[in-house]
C-alpha cells in the first residue's frame, strides 16, 4: 500500500483527489508542509486557480524547497494535476500583464501559454471530456486501452515543452494540447484523473503502483 502525501497550499481542492487515492486502496495524507511528505512513498500536487497565486502560496509556505527535497533528492514519484502540472514549468504567461512571466517550479523544461484554438467557435476554457493520443509508453498508462483514454479537462492554459520526449500524451482542441508530461520520477496530467471516472481511476492506480 502506498502512503500518499497530497499537498494542500491553501487554494487547491484536495478532497476529490484524496477520495480517489482511498478508492484505489491506498493511504492519503493531506499535508501543508514537510510533515507527511518525508514519510510518504508518493506525492500528489493538485491545482485549481491562477498560476501566480498558487506559486506565491507555495513559496510562502516553503513548499518549493520541500518538493525539491522530496522529488529531486529523495526520488519520490510525483503526480501533478491540472494547474499542478503547469506549476512544474519554468514560466507562465497567465495574468502576466506587465510582460513579466510568472516563475514556476522549473521541474520540467517548459513554459505555460494561453490556449489559442484555430477554430473561433471553440470556447475557452477547454472544459469537458476529451480523448488523448499516447505518444510513448509510460508506467502510468500500462494496460490502458486506446479506447479508454478519455479524460476530463478544465483549463485555459497549456504547457509547451522544450523537449518533446517529455510529452507522453496529447489532446486536440483546435490546437495540440499537452495532456501528459513525464520526466524521471515526475508526471503531470493537464486533465483531472480524479474526475475522469474509470479511466482516471485506472491511471491513478498505475501511478500509485509506480516505483521509478
UniProtKB/Swiss-Prot annotation:
<dbReference type="GO" id="GO:0000105">
    <property type="term" value="P:L-histidine biosynthetic process"/>
</dbReference>
<keyword id="KW-0315">Glutamine amidotransferase</keyword>
<dbReference type="InterPro" id="IPR029062">
    <property type="entry name" value="Class_I_gatase-like"/>
</dbReference>
<keyword id="KW-0456">Lyase</keyword>
<keyword id="KW-0028">Amino-acid biosynthesis</keyword>
<protein>
    <recommendedName>
        <fullName>Imidazole glycerol phosphate synthase subunit HisH 2</fullName>
        <ecNumber>4.3.2.10</ecNumber>
        <ecNumber>3.5.1.2</ecNumber>
    </recommendedName>
</protein>
<feature type="active site">
    <location>
        <position position="192"/>
    </location>
</feature>
<feature type="domain" description="Glutamine amidotransferase type-1">
    <location>
        <begin position="3"/>
        <end position="212"/>
    </location>
</feature>
<comment type="pathway">
    <text>Amino-acid biosynthesis; L-histidine biosynthesis; L-histidine from 5-phospho-alpha-D-ribose 1-diphosphate: step 5/9.</text>
</comment>
<dbReference type="Pfam" id="PF00117">
    <property type="entry name" value="GATase"/>
</dbReference>
<dbReference type="InterPro" id="IPR017926">
    <property type="entry name" value="GATASE"/>
</dbReference>
<comment type="function">
    <text>IGPS catalyzes the conversion of PRFAR and glutamine to IGP, AICAR and glutamate. The HisH subunit provides the glutamine amidotransferase activity that produces the ammonia necessary to HisF for the synthesis of IGP and AICAR.</text>
</comment>
<dbReference type="InterPro" id="IPR010139">
    <property type="entry name" value="Imidazole-glycPsynth_HisH"/>
</dbReference>
<comment type="subunit">
    <text>Heterodimer of HisH and HisF.</text>
</comment>
<feature type="active site" description="Nucleophile">
    <location>
        <position position="82"/>
    </location>
</feature>
<keyword id="KW-0963">Cytoplasm</keyword>
<dbReference type="GO" id="GO:0000107">
    <property type="term" value="F:imidazoleglycerol-phosphate synthase activity"/>
</dbReference>
<dbReference type="GO" id="GO:0005737">
    <property type="term" value="C:cytoplasm"/>
</dbReference>
<keyword id="KW-0378">Hydrolase</keyword>
<keyword id="KW-0368">Histidine biosynthesis</keyword>
<feature type="active site">
    <location>
        <position position="194"/>
    </location>
</feature>
<dbReference type="GO" id="GO:0016829">
    <property type="term" value="F:lyase activity"/>
</dbReference>
<dbReference type="GO" id="GO:0004359">
    <property type="term" value="F:glutaminase activity"/>
</dbReference>
